[in-house]
Structure formats: structure tokens, C-alpha cells
């Protein structure tokens, strides 16, 4: 790497790395703790940014545009705790599977602090609609739990 590259890299990823809302959901493999674990942002920052730019007309002109953008932004801060291997597998699915289907595709089972099996909150509909249009993906029909933006505060 070039000299000083790590500083530029860290600065570009500051929001992504330093801003997170912990769901306190962990994959069953991460709970076992036999491998290296990491945080996974449920929505990648580049995915959120690209969706916002491609839908700027909605976010700028729609009466509730800011609310829709803020909901997307909040979801982009949600993190789970998974194994490094699971995180790497999830990263490879961008543009191949809808975000709402990725954990199922990799076979990641999540649990909360008490050990109860849980589901990820559904990403905002605008993201799923955008992924279908942008990447030509098919909807599997899987319907994750929908959470209003105000209720995302439960994770803070």
C-alpha cells in the first residue's frame, strides 16, 4: 500500500466504521466463538448511497422524501455479530440476492441476548424495489419483520 493510504481509507470509512446501531443479534456460529468474529452492517454503506443517488428524485421531491432517506440511513447503521467467514460470504452476494434474503441464503441463524432465535428487520421497501430494478433480481417472497423507523430506536 502507498504511504498514508490507511489514513485516507480510514477517513473515507469513518461513518461506516464508527457509526453503528447494535442489534445485539449474533449468529449461532459467532456465539460459539471458535472463529474470528466481526460486525456486519445489514445494509452496506455503498448500497445505501447508490440507492439514494439513483432515487434522488424521490428523496428530494417527495413530501416524505427525507423520512424515506432517513429510514434507509438508519437501517444502514444496524449491525449484527457474525463470523468473519459469514461476513465474507454475505459480501459476495451484493447484486446477486436481495438484501432481505442474504442471511437465509448463507444459512445464518441469529439469536438475541437471551438466546432466542430472531429475524433481521426488513430493509426499507425502496431498497428492495431498487435492487430488483438495478440488478434484475427476483423476489423470493420472503417477508421479514417490518419495523417503523421510530422503533429502530429499540436497538440504541
Q: Where are the regions a protein language model picked out?
A:
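Generic local-structure boundary detector
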Residues: 48-59, 84, 90-94, 114, ...
Amino acid at each position: 500500500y502507498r504511504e498514508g493510504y490507511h489514513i485516507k481509507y480510514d477517513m473515507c470509512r469513518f461513518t461506516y466504521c464508527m457509526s453503528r446501531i447494535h442489534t445485539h443479534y449474533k449468529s449461532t456460529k459467532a456465539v460459539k466463538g471458535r472463529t474470528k468474529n466481526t460486525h456486519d452492517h445489514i445494509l452496506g454503506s455503498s448500497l445505501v448511497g447508490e440507492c439514494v443517488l439513483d432515487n434522488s428524485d424521490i428523496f428530494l421531491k417527495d413530501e416524505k422524501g427525507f423520512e424515506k432517506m432517513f429510514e434507509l440511513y438508519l437501517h444502514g447503521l444496524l449491525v449484527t455479530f457474525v463470523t468473519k467467514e459469514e461476513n465474507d460470504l454475505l459480501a459476495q452476494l451484493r447484486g446477486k440476492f436481495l438484501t432481505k434474503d442474504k442471511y437465509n441464503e448463507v444459512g445464518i441463524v441469529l439469536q438475541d441476548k437471551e438466546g432466542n432465535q430472531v429475524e433481521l428487520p426488513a430493509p426499507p421497501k425502496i431498497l428492495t424495489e431498487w435492487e430488483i430494478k438495478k440488478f434484475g433480481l427476483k423476489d423470493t417472497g420472503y417477508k421479514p419483520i417490518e419495523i417503523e423507523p421510530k422503533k429502530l430506536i429499540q436497538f440504541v
